[in-house]
């Protein structure tokens, strides 16, 4: 029996429509539109694509979008000064600094300089700590987007054995905290994990984020499992595939997210959700 496809494109559009409707209500009530500042340092082609999609969605939902395209020669102190200015700017609710940053700029220092109430990527240690303490404020976009997918498909996560493959700060680690919060018994696997297959064969819910095409063979998937594939890998042929071998996995899983069109669209939709949340929960009352 083929798995049900988790259609991230459709759910992401629903989320964007909900945010756009809320922006319209705000403007009708005499309030300002939420504002997002997107900072890009250097000319990494992949980063440029991500940034342009984020800016486009901002315009779609009626946000104020500000772009800061800085040369690769920008110093760390120049970038930190810009962040200080944006932290103080009352028209800006969210600050997004596109990673990776050029050599010589400390990612951690930059992330920690963003005011936690404007950290719409959800990477600041304060926001990660709040999630860890079961009192989340702004949450990392991809994990929160995955939780939204599970909720919209009415998938009951309580009591499931969840396995997260990949332990990055951006996806794997916050994802494990989100799944704990969602009532799962959660295992995080990484490059030092022994017998990865054993963990995956026992996973009721599997989230894979390693950035290696077809890294998880489809026959490892437990029958009836829910599979969320975060990987976006472009093959030499130009085809885009995930980290899970889709064709075989689809025959075994009960739900599976495709690549493209699964988790990917949810990341940007969640960024927009986070920016609206930052505006309404943290900044409206300060004005």
Swiss-Prot record:
GO CC annotation terms, alphabetical: cytosol
Listed pathway(s): One-carbon metabolism; tetrahydrofolate interconversion
Reactions this protein catalyses: (6R)-5,10-methylene-5,6,7,8-tetrahydrofolate + NADP(+) = (6R)-5,10-methenyltetrahydrofolate + NADPH; (6R)-5,10-methenyltetrahydrofolate + H2O = (6R)-10-formyltetrahydrofolate + H(+)
InterPro entries on file: Aminoacid_DH-like_N_sf, NAD(P)-bd_dom_sf, THF_DH/CycHdrlase, THF_DH/CycHdrlase_cat_dom, THF_DH/CycHdrlase_CS, THF_DH/CycHdrlase_NAD-bd_dom
GO terms under biological process: L-histidine biosynthetic process; methionine biosynthetic process; purine nucleotide biosynthetic process; tetrahydrofolate interconversion
Gene Ontology MF terms: methenyltetrahydrofolate cyclohydrolase activity; methylenetetrahydrofolate dehydrogenase (NADP+) activity
Function: Catalyzes the oxidation of 5,10-methylenetetrahydrofolate to 5,10-methenyltetrahydrofolate and then the hydrolysis of 5,10-methenyltetrahydrofolate to 10-formyltetrahydrofolate.
Similarity section: Belongs to the tetrahydrofolate dehydrogenase/cyclohydrolase family.
Name of the protein in its database record: Bifunctional protein FolD
Organism: Pectobacterium carotovorum subsp. carotovorum (strain PC1)
């Amino acid at each position: 029996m083929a798995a049900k496809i988790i259609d991230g494109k459709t759910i992401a559009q629903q989320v964007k429509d909900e945010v756009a409707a809320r922006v319209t209500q705000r403007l009708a009530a005499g309030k300002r539109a939420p504002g997002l500042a997107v900072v890009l340092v250097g000319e990494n082609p992949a980063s440029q694509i991500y940034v342009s999609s984020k800016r486009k969605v901002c315009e779609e939902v009626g946000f104020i979008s500000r772009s800061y395209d800085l040369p690769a020669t920008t110093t760390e102190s120049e970038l930190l000064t810009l962040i200080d200015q944006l932290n103080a700017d009352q028209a800006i609710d969210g600050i997004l600094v596109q990673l990776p940053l050029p050599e010589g700029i400390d990612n951690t220092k930059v992330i920690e300089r963003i005011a936690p109430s404007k950290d719409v990527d959800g990477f600041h240690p304060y926001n990660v700590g709040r999630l860890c303490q079961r009192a989340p404020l702004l949450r990392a976009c991809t994990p929160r987007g995955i939780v939204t997918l599970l909720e919209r498909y009415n998938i009951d996560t309580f009591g499931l054995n969840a396995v997260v493959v990949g332990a990055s700060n951006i996806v794997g680690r916050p994802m494990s905290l989100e799944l704990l919060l969602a009532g799962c018994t959660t295992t995080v696997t990484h490059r030092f994990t022994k017998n990865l297959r054993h963990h995956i064969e026992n996973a009721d819910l599997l989230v894979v984020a390693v950035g290696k095409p077809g890294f998880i063979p489809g026959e490892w998937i437990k029958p009836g499992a829910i599979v969320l594939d975060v990987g976006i890998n472009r093959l030499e042929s130009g085809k885009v595939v995930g980290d899970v071998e889709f064709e075989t996995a689809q025959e075994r899983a009960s739900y599976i997210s495709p690549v493209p069109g699964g988790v990917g669209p949810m990341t940007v939709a969640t960024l927009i959700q986070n920016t609206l949340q930052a505006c309404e929960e943290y900044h409206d009352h300060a004005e």
